[in-house]
UniProtKB/Swiss-Prot annotation:
Disulfide bonds: none annotated. Gene3D superfamilies: Ribosomal protein L11, C-terminal domain, Ribosomal protein L11/L12, N-terminal domain. Part of the ribosomal stalk of the 50S ribosomal subunit. Interacts with L10 and the large rRNA to form the base of the stalk. L10 forms an elongated spine to which L12 dimers bind in a sequential fashion forming a multimeric L10(L12)X complex. GO terms for cellular component: cytosolic large ribosomal subunit. The gene is rplK. Pfam families: Ribosomal_L11, Ribosomal_L11_N. It comes from Lactococcus lactis subsp. cremoris (strain MG1363). Forms part of the ribosomal stalk which helps the ribosome interact with GTP-bound translation factors. This is Large ribosomal subunit protein uL11. Belongs to the universal ribosomal protein uL11 family. One or more lysine residues are methylated. One of its GO terms (biological process) is translation. It comes from the Bacteria. The keyword RNA-binding applies. InterPro entries: Ribosomal_uL11 (IPR000911), Ribosomal_uL11_bac-typ (IPR006519), Ribosomal_uL11_C (IPR020783), Ribosomal_uL11_C_sf (IPR036769), Ribosomal_uL11_N (IPR020784), Ribosomal_uL11_N_sf (IPR036796).
Length: 141
């Protein structure tokens, strides 16, 4: 008989820096997962993406084993890195904090394509542009 998925745990963890401390430990402890096993495997798999926040979806099975899928970093994190700022604007429609180019938007859209619900790069670019505008960034050619 196939293993049944008992629980899905979604987290955003800095690449290569998963530790048993919160938020990882409590979330996985409640599901009965081997926390050290997860942290070692996650850190090994994401070591090349240092400095990024990596979303991860952990499938916990009824025998307490697990598998996980790492996704691409959130668009907001990629935009902040591209613009070289720490955080977006508190009032995005009034105060603009940075600007990003269409080329940077296209690069981010191509990177995020596997995780976005978009049929083409152009559609993905408009999604990323919307995120940029809601963060108080201006989009330039």
């Amino acid at each position: 008989m196939a293993k049944q998925v008992e629980k899905l745990v979604k987290l955003q963890i800095p690449a290569g820096k998963a530790t048993p401390a919160p938020p990882v430990g409590p979330a996985l402890g409640q599901a009965g997962v081997n926390i050290m096993g997860f942290t070692k495997e996650f850190n090994a798999r994401t070591a090349d993406q240092a400095g990024m926040i990596i979303p991860v979806v952990i499938s916990v099975y009824d025998d307490k084993s697990f598998t996980f899928i790492t996704k691409t970093p959130p668009a907001a994190v990629l935009l902040k890195k591209a613009a070289g700022v720490q955080k977006g604007s508190g009032e995005p429609n009034k105060t603009k904090v940075a600007s990003v180019t269409k080329a940077q938007i296209k690069e981010i859209a191509e990177l995020k394509m596997p995780d976005l619900n978009a049929a083409s790069v152009e559609t993905a670019m408009s999604m990323i542009e919307g995120t940029a505008k809601s963060m108080g960034f201006t989009v330039t050619d």
